[in-house]
């Protein structure tokens, strides 16, 4: 109880001291190292995470600790240990206990060929795929929070708490998770994707995913026209051993091979840079003036276009889960259409197993709360807060 009280005091102090970070502001936030939320297992405690030099988890095998990065590299840092003797490039199978995720990588820094497993409904007992047999020099297991799908992007934590979402992000990496709400850091632009920040992320105990660049195809956002440089920056974050989300591009640059995200995914595959989740933005751009005679007909037509877009993206990236980190029916539309689309789109996204998370983007003229000092929910905010949402994942994640 004392630790929980201290934790809440730290959270409140951190949140109150941080200025708002706008999505539309190119300035990178200062990184604030968060408190430790989940301590590592005490000495002598077995985690149940077992690696084996044989197929089907047979002997010889050994257990590894939670949070620690095991590598063939020599590291003096607290969060690193050498792989047990005889296991570098010798791991053939493993047991991952339920409620955790694990990354196995070819290179000692977590880059190169790699794979991320998530044990959601049961322990995962697997042989490594052929592409990693005799190659693993990096292993990390961290706890995985299988939270519900509905979240929000907001720069003020008071708004986030009022909305009663399961997860949030703020286009930066300077806030923290609390027991009821998970935080997902974002390396908004290329300067945020650095070895120094990767080291800090490794030390955090309140995160299991990372969002990467925000609209790198846009001149007024991350603005990263050099695809090879974007992949190289992205690879810094692979060193964390966390589950990785792709850069989130504007809606028209997501599904065509010759557009920004298609080029990035092709280059990432060539570099063997793992992408676990594709992050997406959608605002019905191009149809925002194509309105119907009633709000309901308009919302229905928008939902139909959204469904087509989702199908196209899923067809383009069938091996990745999807997160809609920004979406709405268009900032120019009225509140009635937003409310209708908000409910119908969430219901549809809830029905898709390959869509893990989604976050409605509240237009400036239709905020989620009244703001300071009371942060009372508006009609928009109340509607979003009351939408039911299932768990992000309903099965173990076992890539091939």
Predicted regions: what is each one?
Residues 137, 179-189, 348-400:
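Aromatic-rich peripheral "rim/lid" segments of glycoside hydrolase catalytic domains that contact
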Residues 109-110, 157-158, 172-176, 188-193, ...:
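Solvent-exposed loop/turn segments at secondary-structure junctions
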Residues 170, 185, 214, 261-304, ...:
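Aromatic- and acid-rich polysaccharide-binding/catalytic face
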Residues 86-89, 149-211, 217-218, 227-228:
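N-terminal carbohydrate-binding/catalytic regions of secreted carbohydrate-active enzymes
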Residues 22-25:
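Bacterial signal peptide processing site
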Residues 29-151, 156-164, 175-177, 392-395, ...:
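Compact beta-sheet-dominated domain cores in extracellular/mature segments
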Residues 17-20:
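C-terminal motif of bacterial Sec signal peptides marking the signal peptidase cleavage site
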Residues 159-163, 174-184, 196-207, 233-241, ...:
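Acidic (Asp/Glu)-rich catalytic clusters
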